[in-house]
């Protein structure tokens, strides 16, 4: 995961000149005659994670309606040009997935149809309304947020970005939370979106199972309601 969430290239894939420069310099910046020296749009361009998404979605790279997938799918991004929410329910699946995770300042935005798209969390981070508009009669929402951070959680760029995202999407979040049929919020304090160690993953799975078991009667009631 550290490799996927970076712009690194495996050393054996690098030409000699690139290997040499990587050993000498800590950072690299773009330079062109038109723009001169330019600062990147994100700390990470996201090519490695996009390559992973492309590999995992082989067979669904053409422009398709996502509701025709084996499990209907949609995701939410935000257009940085006008600030509007963009529900991505068609197009190239790996590109939509990459746009959805373009955390501002961390991952570079994705440009699609003249829109500059970033993580939809700033506009709609709990999109129950999107699921209902797609035809979902019963919605079960698993909220992975851990609430607003205190001063200890705001000592790094990721914490600050998370807090800004939470503030910007607060109204939409509360509205969607109110309309979900079953709300579950596992305790993920102490973990971040980059917690990919085996120990962290096992702990988060256990906490998720604990919340599901605590809501077992409600889950069974919903199952009975839809006739299963």
Tell me what each language-model feature is.
Residues 1-228:
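Patatin-like phospholipase
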